[in-house]
């Protein structure tokens, strides 16, 4: 085998007369270098006789360059040169030699023997043509290089020992945990000792179920200790622990498992570090090479489902070696890995996320409010509660008062009628409930008149009416309708009808005119117009309300076939159209009222006529407008994360605001289904774009129709700028109809000094348009070189509003909009389709107007050993190249879920005395947490957070 070239030279001082003693060992280099071995030898004494007694011998040094082949016992002399030496220089070289001494391998011993024989031969007595000055300079240079390398490495090692402290070790513990909340479960909240005992009991229980004949297989170790989704990583931990026992195990007993468990759950940093080191050090030589780091990186990437990182493991292994092994030894030791982990915070600070340094001034104490008394706390809490809910409160109060007034009015009216003497309070209760039903059947249509609401959003009514809660109000009214039906129908069937049937002749005379003088039977009452329409309405509304519930509409209810068709959006959509029949029956039912003969007493049509006409007009407008807004599909792209990107032609006269949404219909799939999607293009763009996550049956069918037989791997938004989409193909696609745009909470983003935009997965789409609009306006401002200070007009759809905001509620100043965007996704591939947005911000956001924060939840949190190495590679690569290893942009991707309390606290510190608009699109569970944090921070700081959730 060939010896690699050495990166330095050594010299040996001895008398030529004595030759080379076989006992003298050649120094093997710890450095990784080439097959060139510079050896410094003492040559012949020039004039031994010239020296007087007691004088020093002037020695001559010879530098010999050899190439050795240990395999075939051959040696090649590549070069030879003389170098002058003095005693002081020789002593320096001897000092270097002493520091470099170490045990030789078999190969180095054979080299020494070869050199000994060779140097004794007469051929080595040849003198060279080099001058004494050149030899002297060469020696100085080689000695300086050697000393520099050794000094630098030793200094780094000494510095690492000096900087190691308890506090740094404690911080490092958070970055190297084999057992944490992901393995022990979130329910464990007690102290560690108690927690560890509880966890071991769970491990014991899993051992009993997984073991066979009292032995646990190596492949089941991960599941047993809680690393369910990281089988390969757990096996590597298993092998590392087994190597400590000098064993190669395939199965372990319960006692051995307990020993392994104690090691991986040890709270000592040194213990965890040693396990992590042993995982990489597969050959147990106390050194980690580039290949071993690569293998550990691939294990970590596999455990975190990062296929792209797995492909680039070799590149990132070289990056780690470059950082930890600057001397190019070819390996790293335990102390170097320890240094990397202990300096985790320094690496993280060295690699900052994009635009985080700009923005408001951090005032950690000045914006905090610390009420001293309970009264002050309650007053502040009440104040925030009123500010957050006063719009909802007055609307609900007016609604409840209207229902109460109508109920009491009818109750008192029928108490004065003769029928009250027959049926008593059952009649008054039923009629009072009926009156509230008329009101609610009218009001329930208004929140779904989207065109009307969109227009009202542009008026001053938006200041006092919570249009964002239209769907919630629709649901509340529906619940009131259900209660009204129950009271009205229940009292009639259980109380009124039996009293009529069982009334005495004297009592029946009082109400005989309502029944044409004939006492009805129960069958007569049920088969009359009132009974048939009433029962039919109860049945139809029950079906519609049930299938519109969250569990049925979102497919959370699992039913056997063919009943499974009763769940999902389609079932909700079609059964809701049964309410058309209900309204027709309601008019008929209200016409054939008992005990009401005059036309003005039959008021049902008066309640519902205006809302019904308005709703019918809106549906008619949708039908007409959709034909006018028929669009051409310009580009279809299937993006990572099952996201379908559609770029369509912009219909003539189609105007919208950032944050609004549209309804899409594909007649090829269904002529009746309309589905809402947020607009992701900016108002100033020439195209109209949406991004659709293929989850339901309609979106799956849309993807099939648009992508069948076509290669759609191009990531449009990731490879083209917002203002000009590249290579748009005019392809013969199915027809799409567009209805809208419709108002959404996000369109009011200009009302705030600061924005906090939070999107989960595909929930980022409502905010893409806002970010584009902010950047487009910023670009226009730079071009025009002017700063708009006029009040923002709500009637403008293509706003000239740039970075100015309306007058701040705190102090009257107009402040530049600062946007903090948090995107949380669990699909590593989803980052690809959002890359264009991040790259555009990198290019255009020179003012630091927008902060981007990406969170990838498929990666274990920063405290998990499975993500520790990935986190370090990410920080090193970002610090060196300025690019994130996951997103491919300057925006660094965070791991696991955000700590929302810290997010809100940070924004409150940066923006004291400001109003922050919090806009969220995602699942309801996170919405509750965000709303709570917004309320808490509004009470504790001078920053006010106003929370808004997207509803479709």
Swiss-Prot record:
GO terms for molecular function: calcium ion binding; oxidoreductase activity, acting on NAD(P)H, oxygen as acceptor; peroxidase activity. It is an enzyme of class 1 (oxidoreductase). Keywords: Calcium, FAD, Flavoprotein, Membrane, Metal-binding, NADP, Oxidoreductase, Peroxidase, Repeat, Transmembrane, Transmembrane helix. It comes from the Eukaryota. Residues 431-587 form the Ferric oxidoreductase domain. Its EC number is 1.11.1.-, 1.6.3.-. Residues 414-475, 553-574, 622-750 are extracellular. GO terms for cellular component: membrane. Residues 268-303, 312-347 form the EF-hand domain. It is found in: Membrane. The chain crosses the membrane at residues 393-413, 476-496, 532-552, 575-595, 604-621, 751-771. Residues 626-748 form the FAD-binding FR-type domain. Residues 245-256 are annotated as: EF-hand-like 2. It is a multi-pass membrane protein. Expressed in roots, inflorescences, leaves and stems. It holds the Pfam family NAD_binding_6. Ca(2+) binds at residues 281, 283, 285, 287, 292. Residues 1-392, 497-531, 596-603, 772-952 are cytoplasmic. Residues 211-219 are annotated as: EF-hand-like 1. Monomer and homodimer. Calcium-dependent NADPH oxidase that generates superoxide. Belongs to the RBOH (TC 5.B.1.3) family. This is Respiratory burst oxidase homolog protein E. It comes from Arabidopsis thaliana (Mouse-ear cress). The gene is RBOHE.
């Amino acid at each position: 085998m060939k010896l690699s070239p050495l990166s330095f030279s050594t010299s040996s001082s001895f008398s030529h007369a004595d030759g080379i003693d076989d006992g003298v060992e050649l120094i093997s280099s710890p450095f990784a270098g080439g097959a060139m071995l510079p050896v410094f030898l003492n040559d012949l004494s020039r004039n031994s006789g010239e020296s007087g007694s007691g004088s020093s011998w002037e020695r001559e040094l010879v530098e010999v360059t050899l190439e050795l082949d240990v395999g075939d016992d051959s040696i090649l002399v590549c070069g030879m040169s003389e170098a002058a030496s003095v005693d002081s220089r020789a002593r320096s070289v001897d000092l270097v030699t002493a520091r470099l001494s170490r045990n030789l391998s078999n190969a180095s011993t054979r080299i020494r023997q070869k050199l000994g024989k060779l140097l004794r031969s007469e051929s080595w007595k040849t003198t060279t043509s080099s001058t004494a000055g050149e030899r002297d300079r060469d020696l100085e240079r080689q000695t300086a290089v050697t000393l520099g390398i050794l000094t630098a490495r030793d200094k780094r090692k000494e510095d690492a020992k000096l900087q190691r402290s308890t506090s740094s070790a404690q911080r490092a513990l958070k970055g190297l945990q084999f057992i944490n909340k992901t393995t022990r479960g979130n329910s464990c909240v007690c102290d560690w000792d108690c927690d560890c005992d509880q966890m071991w009991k769970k491990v014991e229980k899993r051992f009993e179920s997984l073991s066979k004949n009292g032995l646990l297989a190596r492949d089941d170790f991960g599941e047993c200790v809680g690393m369910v989704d990281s089988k390969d990583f757990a096996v590597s931990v298993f092998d590392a622990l087994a190597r400590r026992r000098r064993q190669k195990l395939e199965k372990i007993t319960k006692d051995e498992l307990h020993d392994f468990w104690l090691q991986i759950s040890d709270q000592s940093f040194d213990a965890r570090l040693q396990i992590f080191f042993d995982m990489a050090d597969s050959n147990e030589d106390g050194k980690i090479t580039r290949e071993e780091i690569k293998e550990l990186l691939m294990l970590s990437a596999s455990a975190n489902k990062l296929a792209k990182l797995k492909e680039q493991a070799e590149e990132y292994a070289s990056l780690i070696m470059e950082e930890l092994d600057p001397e190019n030894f070819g390996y790293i030791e335990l102390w170097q890995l320890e240094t990397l982990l202990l300096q985790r915070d320094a690496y993280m600070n060295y690699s900052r996320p994009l635009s985080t340094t700009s923005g408001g001034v951090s005032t950690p104490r000045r914006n905090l409010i610390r009420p001293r008394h309970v009264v002050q706390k309650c007053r502040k809490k009440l104040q925030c509660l009123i500010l957050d809910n006063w719009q909802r409160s007055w609307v609900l109060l007016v609604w409840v008062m209207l229902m109460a007034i109508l109920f009491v009015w009818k109750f008192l009216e029928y108490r004065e009628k003769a029928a009250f003497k027959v049926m008593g309070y059952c009649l008054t209760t039923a009629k009072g409930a009926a009156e509230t039903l008329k009101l609610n059947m009218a009001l329930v249509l208004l929140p779904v008149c989207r065109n009307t609401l969109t227009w009202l959003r542009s008026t001053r009514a938006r200041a006092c009416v919570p249009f964002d809660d239209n769907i919630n109000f629709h649901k509340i009214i529906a619940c009131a309708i259900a209660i009204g039906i129950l009271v009205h129908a229940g009292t009639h069937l259980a109380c009124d009808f039996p009293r009529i049937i069982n009334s005495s002749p004297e009592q029946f005379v009082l109400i005989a005119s309502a029944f044409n003088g004939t006492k009805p039977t129960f069958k007569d009452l049920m088969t009359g117009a009132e009974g048939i329409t009433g029962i039919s309405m109860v049945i139809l509304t029950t079906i519609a309300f049930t299938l519109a519930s969250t569990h049925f509409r979102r497919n959370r209810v699992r039913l056997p076939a063919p009943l499974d068709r009763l769940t999902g959006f389609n079932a909700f959509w079609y059964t809701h159209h049964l309410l058309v029949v209900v309204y027709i029956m309601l008019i008929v039912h209200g016409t054939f009222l008992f005990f009401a003969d005059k036309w003005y007493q039959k008021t049902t049509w008066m309640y519902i006529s205006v809302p019904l006409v308005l709703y019918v007009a809106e549906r008619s407008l949708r039908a007409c407008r959709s034909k006018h807004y028929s669009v051409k599909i310009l580009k279809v792209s299937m993006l990572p994360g099952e996201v379908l990107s559609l770029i369509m032609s912009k219909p003539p006269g189609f105007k919208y605001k950032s944050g609004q949404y549209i309804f899409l219909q594909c007649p090829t799939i269904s002529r009746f289904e309309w589905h809402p999607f947020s607009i992701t293009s900016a108002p100033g763009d020439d195209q109209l774009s949406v991004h659709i996550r293929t989850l339901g049956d309609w979106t799956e069918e849309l993807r099939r129709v648009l992508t069948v037989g076509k290669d759609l791997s191009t990531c449009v938004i990731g490879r083209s700028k917002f203002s000009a989409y590249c290579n748009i193909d005019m392809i013969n696609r199915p027809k799409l109809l567009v209805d809208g745009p419709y108002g959404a909470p996000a369109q009011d983003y200009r009302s705030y000094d600061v924005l906090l935009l939070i999107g989960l997965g595909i929930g980022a789409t409502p905010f893409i348009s806002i970010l584009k609009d902010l950047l487009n306006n910023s670009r226009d401002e730079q071009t025009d070189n002017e700063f708009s200070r006029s009040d923002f007009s709500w009637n403008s759809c293509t706003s000239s509003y740039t970075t100015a905001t309306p007058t701040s509620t705190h102090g009257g100043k107009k402040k530049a909009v600062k946007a903090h965007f948090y995107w949380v996704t669990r699909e590593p591939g989803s980052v690809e389709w959002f890359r264009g947005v991040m790259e555009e911000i990198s290019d255009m956001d020179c003012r630091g107007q927008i902060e981007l924060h990406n969170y990838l939840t498929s990666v274990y949190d920063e405290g998990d050993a499975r993500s520790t190495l990935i986190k370090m590679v990410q920080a090193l690569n970002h610090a060196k190249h300025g690019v994130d290893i996951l997103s491919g942009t300057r925006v660094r991707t965070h791991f696991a879920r955000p700590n929302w309390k810290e997010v809100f606290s940070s924004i409150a510190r940066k923006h004291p005395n400001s109003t922050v608009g919090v806009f969220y699109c995602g699942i309801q569970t996170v919405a509750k947490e965000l709303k709570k944090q917004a309320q808490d921070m509004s009470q504790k700081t001078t920053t006010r957070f106003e929370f808004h959730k997207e509803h479709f």
